[in-house]
Amino acid sequence: MVLALAELLALALWFSASAVIPQLTAAWDLSSAQQSWMTMSVQLGFVVGALFSALLNIADRISNRYLIAVSASIGALLNGAVPVFDAGPDLTLALRFGTGFMLAGVYPPGMKLVATWCKEDRGLGIGILVGAITLGSAMPHLLNAVPLFGDQGIPAWQTVLLTTSGMAFLSALLVGIFVQVGPHLSKTAPFDWRFIGRTLSHRPTRLANFGYLGHMWELYAMWAWTPFLLLASYEAAGWSTQGARLAGFGVVGIGMVGSVVAGLLADRMGRTVITSWSLGISGGCALVVGLFFDHPGLLTALCLIWGIAVVADSAQFSTAVTELTDSRYVGTALTLQTSMGFLLTLLTIRMIPPLVDWVGWEGGFIVLAIGPVFGVISMLRLRGLPEAAQMASGKR
């Protein structure tokens, strides 16, 4: 669908700077903290933007088509300003924050738009969208592995950032021209700042959000640092670093398969079942992945399995919220959910580098398994509630 393609293109902005951290470090002599903040600043900007949108019910009061198109365009400008003005570390972090803020107007509204087109197959629909977002998030790693316009096979960081900005501009055009609202759109909601409080106090929605938080504890730290785990492993074994970059793209991008398959299965078997299995598999991978550091081939295979499982459940937490919450405020509920999840990622993304310095790559990811355990407990508790019958046409 056109919307999925547009989200894929726009979300290439997310890791555009993170993918080229080695080149930026060589150019600007980045510290370890600055390297982490190249990703964390986007997360923080997204959180602030999502909370702003949730408080004002923006996703339920403004045309989502135009919200996505305008947000993607401004995000592209902010991202492109980094190479155009050779911004340096401090200004780049500010521009990355702004990019994240604008992506809050792309991701949650996109899920709401899909929900207007889907009912019985909503899990699959949102799964396809999140799969496209996953592949889009991986695109900078692919661009960074393509030896075009580069020195000794390494592309200039400016090329990667400018290309992703161009992709986001194309996304805005696609949404503005081709995307339409579906037949299941609820009436425009009146402004109600108290809706956030009602959502947080509604136990079924709260448990779905708890499951999402367990998932997010793991996801973005895995996406941010697994490519560098692979790079370190490949270098230690004398393998091609370009191969490591391609593997990094594959590990993130393959999550698209997990999202689509999990969406298809969740509509037939239930959201709580599929999310629990996905969390269990990904948590297990987090526990053992470091043990394969000295075997890059096996490490790559395990990381690909992890890449499928770690994001397979993501769309189903969001779908559950659309089924459990007041239909007039679906956009606000999704924005609130994502803001809480991305706020949590700030902790785990920043946590991995010092853990790796302390225990090495072999044990640096074990802490990520805490999230899946918490998530499984939350989803099993949700499954036991009567309201769970509202999900997946009664399949819970």
Question: PLM features: what roles do these ranges have?
Answer:
Residues 17-18, 204-256, 318, 348-349:
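Extracytoplasmic gate region of multi-pass secondary transporters
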Residues 50-88, 266:
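Conserved MFS/SLC helix-loop-helix module at the cytosolic interface between two early adjacent transmembrane helices
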Residues 120, 128-179:
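Helix-loop-helix hairpin linking two adjacent transmembrane segments in secondary transporters
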Residues 181-210, 396:
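Juxtamembrane intracellular "pre-TM" segments in multi-pass secondary transporters
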Residues 266-317:
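C-terminal transmembrane helical hairpin of 12-TM major facilitator-type secondary transporters
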